[in-house]
Amino acid sequence: MGTFDSQCHECFESKERWYEIGPTDLLERKGSLTLRSHHKKYSEPVLVYSWHRNREAFPKDYDIESLETVKNLCMSTYKRFGSDSPRWMSEAREQMAQVLVNKDLVEKKKTGLLDEETLCPGILERDPELPPTGFRDVPMESPPDPRKPCFSTTYSEDFTPQYEYPPPACPRREEYSIVHRKCRSQFTDLNGSKRLGINTWHDESGIYANSEAKQKLYALARNPIVPF
């Protein structure tokens, strides 16, 4: 029993010393975190899970310190790496570049309506004292009737009537009458603010806006009953 206890004690002491000292090849072991390691260089994958392995997302020929200027496409993970074509452009950058490519977005220069090429000498040579002969002439002054040019059309100038037709028998009345206009009732309609008088909410006088016009109209017709 004594020999067994002594052996166990020596074994525990040796393990404690080994934990205190640590592994002897720490600085030369592959994959260590020190810069003296020859297996992996201190780069982006360090301090990440499974950092001692090669990343699958990186292309196989991605080597910054490589002296080869031409990439080997057979070893690349993606076909895009190592090609001589221009770099990819993001969608936002492509849309912002439309200002320089799209002609519709370019600022347009404003040009005058009349210049040396488009100016007709007949406009300046026309005598303003001559009477106008039609709608095709440029009026130098405003006509006496402002609405006369609105009724002058190509159809009325080219297709003139053969006969002089008499005016209509019943001419249109120019006066505007409010006799037959229905007013808001003071008794049957609901109370509202659109009323005449001092008290606009309770106006029961029976006098409306067209009462005077109705009295004049029905007085000529000799109607004894004058409606309100």
From Swiss-Prot:
<keyword id="KW-0963">Cytoplasm</keyword>
<keyword id="KW-0206">Cytoskeleton</keyword>
<keyword id="KW-0812">Transmembrane</keyword>
<dbReference type="GO" id="GO:0005737">
    <property type="term" value="C:cytoplasm"/>
</dbReference>
<protein>
    <recommendedName>
        <fullName>Cilia- and flagella-associated protein 95</fullName>
    </recommendedName>
</protein>
<keyword id="KW-1003">Cell membrane</keyword>
<feature type="topological domain" description="Cytoplasmic">
    <location>
        <begin position="140"/>
        <end position="228"/>
    </location>
</feature>
<comment type="function">
    <text>Microtubule inner protein (MIP) part of the dynein-decorated doublet microtubules (DMTs) in cilia axoneme, which is required for motile cilia beating.</text>
</comment>
<keyword id="KW-0282">Flagellum</keyword>
<feature type="transmembrane region" description="Helical">
    <location>
        <begin position="123"/>
        <end position="139"/>
    </location>
</feature>
<dbReference type="GO" id="GO:0036126">
    <property type="term" value="C:sperm flagellum"/>
</dbReference>
<dbReference type="InterPro" id="IPR027905">
    <property type="entry name" value="CFAP95"/>
</dbReference>
<keyword id="KW-1133">Transmembrane helix</keyword>
<dbReference type="GO" id="GO:0030317">
    <property type="term" value="P:flagellated sperm motility"/>
</dbReference>
<keyword id="KW-0966">Cell projection</keyword>
<keyword id="KW-0472">Membrane</keyword>
<comment type="subunit">
    <text>Microtubule inner protein component of sperm flagellar doublet microtubules. Interacts with MYH9. Interacts with MYH10.</text>
</comment>
<feature type="topological domain" description="Extracellular">
    <location>
        <begin position="1"/>
        <end position="122"/>
    </location>
</feature>
<feature type="region of interest" description="Disordered">
    <location>
        <begin position="123"/>
        <end position="147"/>
    </location>
</feature>
<keyword id="KW-0969">Cilium</keyword>
<dbReference type="Pfam" id="PF15139">
    <property type="entry name" value="CFAP95"/>
</dbReference>
<feature type="region of interest" description="Mn">
    <location>
        <begin position="152"/>
        <end position="162"/>
    </location>
</feature>
<dbReference type="GO" id="GO:0160111">
    <property type="term" value="C:axonemal A tubule inner sheath"/>
</dbReference>
<dbReference type="GO" id="GO:0005879">
    <property type="term" value="C:axonemal microtubule"/>
</dbReference>
<dbReference type="GO" id="GO:0005886">
    <property type="term" value="C:plasma membrane"/>
</dbReference>
